[in-house]
Amino acid sequence: MAKEIKFGEEARRSLEKGVNQLADTVKVTLGPKGRNVVLDKKFGSPLITNDGVTIAKEVELEDKFENMGAQLVKEVATKTNDVAGDGTTTATLLAQAIIREGMKNVAAGANPMILKKGLQKAVDTAVAGIKENSRKVKGKEDIARVATISANEELIGTLIADAMEKVTNDGVITVEESKTMGTNLEVVEGMQFDRGYLSAYMVTDTDKMEAVLDDPYILITDKKLTNIQDLLPILEEIVKQGKKLLIIAEDIEGEALTTLILNKLRGTFVCVAVKAPGFGDRRKAMLQDIAILTGGEVITEELGLDLKETQITQLGKARQVIVQKENTIIVDGNGSAEDIKSRINSIKTQIEDTTSDFDREKLQERLAKLSGGVAVIQVGAATETEMKEKKLRIEDALAATRAAVEEGIVAGGGTAFINVIPEVAKLLESTSGDEKTGVQIILRALEEPVRQIAENAGLEGSVIVEKIKTSEKGMGFDALNEKYIDMIEGGIVDPAKVTRSALQNAVSVAAMVLTTESVVADKPEPEAPAVPAGMPGGMGGMY
């Protein structure tokens, strides 16, 4: 296919045009007084959002060369979202500012490769400054502040702080759509997996249709149970003690299942059977998780363990087990804290090593089940459109709080960028020529988030930037209430990881755009000539 090629200034200008179209669409959402963007959907109602990456993903431009610029900046947003989960609008805005200032200098004759060196030096200094200025998250209040700023709503901040407190930092917090108007939090303590009882005859509470076992033994095996003789020795031992039993096995059917149900109906003893969760190797790993959590062993022939010879000491124990039609919850397992901690560390290592998103998600689920439980935030709203918008904000806020716990918090509202300007400015003494120009470009770009937040609030950005520059470190502008305050004291904070990632990713892509000398794209194919109206198709008019 024939290609169209643009060179030099013309190529860079086309890319810049695309960058500006995408960035101008996204940056109106920044800050407490930022607006929303409406995205058209082929099916269903339009999506209204202020999430940078969601907007960026929808932008596709008609001009091939301009579209390349837009796609490059889209990468800034998606990469920042992948690393930090928030800060996508800031990253896009920074990329635009660096490209804009850089283009002016390249057009004036600056060497892009030397400029790039200056950009990188300045960013490394700025990132070091951001890390130095950050402070650790101290308790629930800080988490609530981060989430409130990210979601732009206090209720959401409080909900997320409650959820993080209940399930710890390693716990899983999921966001679901609620059937009601309100937004609320539901916490499942202990380990939950998606397998329920094998027979409705096993329930102990017929009103709720669930089986509740207090202080039961737990038999964990990867075998398929059909013969009751395999189970008899251990069952007799449990009946003697007057205890209840939960069996987790690959499957239970035939004589084994019938005998268990009959004994339950006769009142001899209470036993509930469920299938093992997961499939293949993941099933083995999950059974091992359950065994460690409950202080038992997985009875498997792979380890030379025979079901007939199972001892009572090989069974797990828990304070309570609740078995529903489709879920089983093990509360307060009897496993040793040391073993559980060691297992958690092992899963964390696997999460770091895996390259598959699916595997990472499944490993994080296992980690959550072992470490604290699962919290579900149920999002409710008057209309579906509002619910989707709210859900996106909550997901962003969740990612921001996790990032804050990881690397700490810095002053929000763009103040963290201005606070590192003095450090970056010191580089002007040790650099010269185009490298020095690269440092100056970053110095200008660091002001951009504050300018944009102010402009979105209908104020003059330059005045506010100068005022913050001459104020003490940590002092910033509260755009919601239009006053200068100590940002951290006032609860306006951003995660250091989000701030750092936004800057690093913006420079990475901006440097690529500035060092571009030619752009190649497919030539648009000429449209086929339209068939004149009124002509008969084929020989249709003849007899």
Swiss-Prot record:
Its EC number is 5.6.1.7. Its main location: cytoplasm. ATP binds at residues 29-32, 86-90, 413, 478-480, 494. It comes from the Bacteria. Gene3D superfamilies: GroEL, GroEL-like equatorial domain, TCP-1-like chaperonin intermediate domain. InterPro entries: Chaperonin_Cpn60_CS (IPR018370), Cpn60/GroEL (IPR001844), Cpn60/GroEL/TCP-1 (IPR002423), GroEL-like_apical_dom_sf (IPR027409), GROEL-like_equatorial_sf (IPR027413), TCP-1-like_intermed_sf (IPR027410). It is found in: Cytoplasm. Residues 524-543 are annotated as: Disordered. GO terms for cellular component: cytoplasm. GO terms for biological process: protein refolding. It is an enzyme of class 5 (isomerase). GO terms for molecular function: ATP binding; ATP-dependent protein folding chaperone; isomerase activity; unfolded protein binding. It catalyses: ATP + H2O + a folded polypeptide = ADP + phosphate + an unfolded polypeptide. Keywords: ATP-binding, Chaperone, Cytoplasm, Isomerase, Nucleotide-binding. NCBIfam families: GroEL, PRK00013.1, PRK12849.1, PRK12850.1, PRK12851.1. Forms a cylinder of 14 subunits composed of two heptameric rings stacked back-to-back. Interacts with the co-chaperonin GroES. Belongs to the chaperonin (HSP60) family. Together with its co-chaperonin GroES, plays an essential role in assisting protein folding. The GroEL-GroES system forms a nano-cage that allows encapsulation of the non-native substrate proteins and provides a physical environment optimized to promote and accelerate protein folding. This is Chaperonin GroEL. The gene is groEL.
